[in-house]
Curated annotation (Swiss-Prot):
GO process terms (BP): conjugation with cellular fusion; cytogamy; karyogamy involved in conjugation with cellular fusion; regulation of actomyosin contractile ring contraction; regulation of division septum assembly
Domain of life according to the entry: Eukaryota
Keyword Phosphoprotein attributed: yes
Modification sites for Phosphothreonine: T20, T88
Residues bearing PTM Phosphoserine: S67, S72, S84, S100, S106
GO cellular component: cytoplasm; mating projection tip; mitochondrion; nucleus
Subcellular location: Cell tip
Name of the protein described by the UniProt record: Nuclear fusion protein FUS2
Keywords assigned by UniProt, alphabetized: Phosphoprotein
Domain DH: 112-326
MF terms in GO: guanyl-nucleotide exchange factor activity
KW Phosphoprotein (keyword) present: yes
Native source species: Saccharomyces cerevisiae (strain ATCC 204508 / S288c)
């Protein structure tokens, strides 16, 4: 007899992988009027002990089933109505209790999967080493070798940064991926090398594959890699076209130095071409997607279902990223002025930012602190200049030239505030007054020169000349072959005069509208404010004598209310001028900068008008591009030279053969000078 509180069934409790059903499964579980429906099972708030679980389940184990035939369980459960009180999903899971994970029966089943992993691992290592070659061989020779230094591109220039882009960052990210896969394969055994022997163990040993079955989460490594490459590869993809254009330009324009540098680097790198390295990131994304697709097709029985099913979402994420890259590259090509390195908030902020604030350099006195600030400002001004090809000037071609101007503008604004603080601390009121007088004198001189500048002067000179020539042409002359084309010439003169009058009208409108509104009116307002400040300075100078008397009386303990009021007024006015005059001078510099920029815009429009308008400028550009497309050695403005030579030849022939006046034309000194007889 057993001395225990458990009955015999409790001692003989079935093991986990067997099933003890509560009744015969071939009969209905319940009927419509059944009064023995199961109670709602509530989850306990605490973990029950093993003994309590057995006691709770005892009522289900007392009645043994009539049959233990379990073949029709799945079919009967699938035919069960959906509103059945039995949780069929849980019951189906109970049928397959704690099945042991299916692992490769032989190492050959996992060999194909890990062969693919090996190929990808070795290709990623090769990709990483090739990227390092671009920096350690090509870039190093370009910067360090005296034979090539500053010959092709300048050190740390934007052209150099565009040529090599952010390859070093891409290489470091690939190294992280290689390290992650290595740690997964070696079960994070530090210091161990993934050599040929380790690969052979992975291919042949069943124990190693069983260990990797539930630990080799390669999809997680790819997921982390995708997070790292998004911004880096986006920047590289959108600048790749300009990168290759710069490479071609250097090869064409600096052929001698380029060939020497390229030949030397080919020998050092083992004949790895730079253009192949630069194109490799563009192809690598497709290779990652293909690798994930191949791994997804053969992971069964090699990885656990939890790890294997993660490969498909990872591959879809890479495909979406690839499509997004193609879209952004196409948008970048269609709108080259768009800067992909800026965030939306930075783009919105840049609308109101002045790109030329870094040009502001207000005059100041020479002192130690100001010199230091000037040196810092000069260092900012000597920063990298944006490339014409790249449109970008960041270290990784990830930040555009616009962003450098913005950063320089911010730094310059901070430098101005620093100067204002130093001026307040070290400069006296007399220094500020002296500077203000110079500034006001310069403003008056600027206004005088702008008023003196007659924009219509060039057109008036052209009108006087063409009118004089027209009078010469239309003077009374005898009929003859020499004057056969006089009507045509007269018509051309008239049309040219009409064109000049139209240009003069456009210039007059430009002068009365944009020049007056954007340049002259703001300048006059600044001068008016300066006049107000100048009057206050005169008041300050007039009160100075009374203030001196006030100080003397105060020292002698003599009180005069009038003197006291004048003295206090002088002190307040003096403090106000010392506090506000430096700020006002800085505002003058800011305003004058905007005025000059507006004047430049107006002057560019003026040049466009006197050049003949946009149509003529467009024709000139087309002619220039046509001349550039023709072989080198083509003479510029050949059409003008040909027209001039033809006209001169025809005129000389008319003078020699069809001279309508009496006498030999070579006998006249004027005719000989004009027509080189």
């Amino acid at each position: 007899m057993f001395k225990t509180s458990y009955n015999l069934y409790d001692l003989n409790y079935p093991k986990n992988d067997s099933l003890t059903p509560i009744r015969d499964y071939k009969n209905d579980y319940f009927h419509k009027n059944d009064d023995k429906l199961p109670e709602i099972v509530r989850k306990p708030t605490r973990k029950l002990s093993k003994h309590e679980n057995k006691l709770n389940d005892k009522k289900f184990t007392n009645k043994r089933p009539a049959s233990l035939d379990l073949h029709s369980i799945v079919e009967s459960l699938s035919n069960k109505k959906i509103y059945s009180p039995i949780n069929t999903e849980i019951f189906q899971n109970v049928v397959r209790l704690n099945l042991s994970p299916q692992i490769p029966n032989s190492p050959h089943e996992g060999c194909k999967f890990y062969k693919i992993v090996q190929e990808f691992y070795l290709s990623e290592v090769e990709y990483y080493n090739n990227l390092l070659t671009a920096n350690n061989v090509y870039r190093k020779a370009l910067n360090s070798d005296p034979r090539f230094k500053n010959k092709l591109v300048k050190l740390d220039s934007s052209d150099e940064l565009l040529l090599f882009g952010n390859i070093d960052t891409i290489a470091s990210i690939s190294k992280i991926l290689v390290t992650a896969i290595k740690d997964l394969l070696l079960a994070k055994q530090r210091g161990k090398m993934l050599d040929a022997n380790e690969w052979q163990k992975i291919f042949t040993k069943n124990e190693v594959q069983q260990q990797l079955y539930s630990t080799f989460d390669i999809s997680e490594a790819f997921e982390q890699h995708l997070l790292r490459i998004k911004s880096t590869y986006t920047s590289y993809f959108v600048s790749h076209q300009k990168q290759m254009e710069l490479f071609t330009t250097l090869r064409m324009n600096k052929n001698h130095f380029f060939n020497k540098w390229y030949e030397y680097c080919l020998k050092e790198s083992g004949c790895i071409k730079l253009e192949d390295i630069l194109k490799s990131p563009m192809k690598r994304l497709t290779q990652w997607i293909d690798t994930l697709e191949t791994l997804e097709s053969c992971y069964e029985d090699i990885l656990s279902p939890e790890l294997g099913l993660k490969l498909s979402p990872t591959r879809r994420k890479y495909s979406l990223f690839s499509n997004k890259l193609e879209t952004e590259v196409s948008e970048y090509k269609s709108n080259s002025m768009y800067n992909f390195s800026l965030t939306p908030s930075e783009i919105i902020q840049s609308y109101d930012e002045d790109q030329f604030t870094h040009l502001l350099k207000p005059p100041d006195k020479q002192n130690k602190n100001i010199c230091n600030a000037s040196r810092q400002e000069s260092n900012l001004d000597n920063s990298r200049v944006p490339s014409l090809l790249s449109g970008s000037s960041s270290y990784y071609s990830d930040v555009s030239g616009l962003e450098i101007v913005t950063n320089t503008s911010t730094a310059s604004a901070e430098m101005i505030n620093l100067k204002m603080d130093e001026e307040t601390e070290f400069f006296t009121l007399a220094d500020h007054i002296s500077k203000f007088k110079k500034v006001m004198k310069g403003l008056l001189e600027l206004k005088k020169n702008l008023l003196k500048n007659d924009l219509s002067g060039i057109i008036d000179i052209s009108l006087r000349r063409i009118n004089a020539w027209k009078k010469v042409i239309e003077c009374e002359r005898p009929s003859g072959a020499f004057f056969a084309h006089d009507n045509l010439i007269s018509t051309m003169c008239s049309s040219y005069i009409d064109k000049l009058h139209e240009q003069k009208n456009q210039v007059t409108i430009l002068k009365l509208t944009e020049l007056e509104t954007d340049v002259m009116n703001p300048l006059e307002r600044i001068i008016a404010h300066c006049t107000t400040v100048k009057s206050k300075l005169k008041d300050l100078q007039a009160l100075k004598k009374d203030y001196m008397l006030f100080l003397q009386e105060k020292k002698a303990n003599v009180r005069d209310i009038k003197r006291d009021l004048l003295g206090m007024h002088f002190q307040n006015l003096q403090n106000q001028m010392k506090r506000e005059l430096p700020v006002f001078i800085t505002l003058i510099h800011d305003t004058i900068e905007c005025i000059l920029l507006n004047y430049i815009k107006v002057f560019l429009k003026y040049l466009e008008i006197i050049a003949g308008g946009k149509k003529y400028l467009q024709k000139d550009l087309e002619n220039m591009s046509l001349n550039d497309s023709i072989a080198t050695g083509q003479i510029k403005n050949l059409d003008i030279l040909q027209c001039y030579s033809k006209s001169r030849y025809m005129t000389k022939r008319m003078v020699r053969k069809d001279w309508p006046f009496p006498g030999d034309p070579s006998g006249s000194r004027v005719v000989r000078k004009l027509f080189e007889l």
